[in-house]
């Protein structure tokens, strides 16, 4: 049986390249989400534009899993780099995903852990391996590691320092991956996060997030398309 791949991006810019590659796509619009159900390079794909933030991502991921039944999920798009080895346009691949803005430590949970859930959501090892292989083949610099999510665009030294204190090995931050991972965990669907860096903490730049975003979308989409060929 041929596999079907779910792909999730938050913003129109993050899914546009992939959407333009799709054929035989039908569009599902529901609850502020858009799902494009079709094919890319003869691989069955369901592409979700979820909207920004963890609630939108959770709604969209649930709809994607229930309505299109993908065998696995790839979360793509942009992220802010916190690992010193990451620069704009580089690729970050999840080895674990956590909420950085959840705190139930008063009841004995780890920082970022929600009750009835693991402290960290672990991606599928095969998907991580495929992502790393295709990133290397494409010649991109890549870091694999912890990706932390929260409903905040992280900038400013104080916020960055707090996240690093709570999660010393954090590689990148963004606003949806932990919600997507939590829904995939609940539905027992394998996932991986493959994003490109749009802005880098602690490094001065005259370029804004908006100027970085097209490059991040291009690079992350290139890796996702290469990954799809492994499941055709």
Swiss-Prot record:
Signal peptide as annotated in the record: none
Recorded metabolic or biological pathway in which this protein acts: Amino-acid biosynthesis; L-methionine biosynthesis via salvage pathway; S-methyl-5-thio-alpha-D-ribose 1-phosphate from S-methyl-5'-thioadenosine (hydrolase route): step 1/2
CDD domains xref list: MTAN (cd09008)
GO molecular function: adenosylhomocysteine nucleosidase activity; methylthioadenosine nucleosidase activity
Reaction catalysis annotation: S-adenosyl-L-homocysteine + H2O = S-(5-deoxy-D-ribos-5-yl)-L-homocysteine + adenine; S-methyl-5'-thioadenosine + H2O = 5-(methylsulfanyl)-D-ribose + adenine; 5'-deoxyadenosine + H2O = 5-deoxy-D-ribose + adenine
Protein residues bound to substrate: 80, 154, 175-176
E.C. number: 3.2.2.9
A GO-annotated cellular component: cytosol
Pfam family membership, one: PNP_UDP_1
Enzyme kind, highest EC tier: hydrolase
Catalytic-site annotation from UniProt: 14, 199
Entry keyword set: Amino-acid biosynthesis, Hydrolase, Methionine biosynthesis
Entry's Gene Ontology BP terms: L-methionine salvage from methylthioadenosine; L-methionine salvage from S-adenosylmethionine; nucleoside catabolic process
Domain of life: Bacteria
Family: Belongs to the PNP/UDP phosphorylase family. MtnN subfamily.
HAMAP family: Salvage_MtnN
NCBIfam families linked: MTA_SAH-Nsdase, PRK05584.1
Role: Catalyzes the irreversible cleavage of the glycosidic bond in both 5'-methylthioadenosine (MTA) and S-adenosylhomocysteine (SAH/AdoHcy) to adenine and the corresponding thioribose, 5'-methylthioribose and S-ribosylhomocysteine, respectively. Also cleaves 5'-deoxyadenosine, a toxic by-product of radical S-adenosylmethionine (SAM) enzymes, into 5-deoxyribose and adenine.
PANTHER family: 5'-METHYLTHIOADENOSINE/S-ADENOSYLHOMOCYSTEINE NUCLEOSIDASE, 5'-METHYLTHIOADENOSINE_S-ADENOSYLHOMOCYSTEINE NUCLEOSIDASE
Protein name as it appears in the record: 5'-methylthioadenosine/S-adenosylhomocysteine nucleosidase
Lineage: Bacteria, Pseudomonadati, Pseudomonadota, Gammaproteobacteria, Pasteurellales
């Amino acid at each position: 049986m041929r596999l079907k791949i779910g792909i999730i991006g938050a913003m129109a810019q993050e899914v546009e390249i992939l959407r333009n590659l799709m054929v035989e796509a039908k569009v599902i619009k529901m609850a502020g989400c858009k799902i494009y159900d079709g094919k890319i390079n003869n691989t069955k794909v369901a592409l979700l534009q979820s909207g920004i933030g963890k609630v939108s991502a959770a709604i969209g991921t649930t709809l994607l899993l229930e309505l299109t039944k993908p065998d696995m999920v790839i979360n793509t798009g942009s992220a802010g780099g916190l690992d010193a080895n990451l620069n704009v346009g580089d690729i970050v691949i999840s080895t674990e995903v956590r909420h950085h803005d959840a705190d139930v430590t008063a009841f004995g949970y780890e920082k970022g852990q929600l009750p009835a859930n693991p402290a960290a959501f672990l991606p599928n090892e095969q998907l991580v391996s495929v992502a790393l292989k295709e990133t290397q083949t494409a010649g991109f610099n890549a870091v694999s590691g912890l990706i932390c999510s929260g409903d905040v665009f992280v900038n400013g030294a104080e916020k960055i320092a707090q996240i690093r204190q709570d999660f010393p090995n954090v590689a990148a931050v963004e606003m949806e991956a932990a919600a997507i991972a939590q829904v995939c965990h609940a539905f027992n669907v394998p996932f991986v996060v493959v994003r490109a860096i749009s802005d880098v903490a602690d490094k001065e730049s005259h370029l804004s997030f908006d100027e970085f975003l097209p490059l991040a979308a291009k690079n992350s989409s290139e890796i996702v398309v290469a990954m799809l060929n492994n499941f055709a």
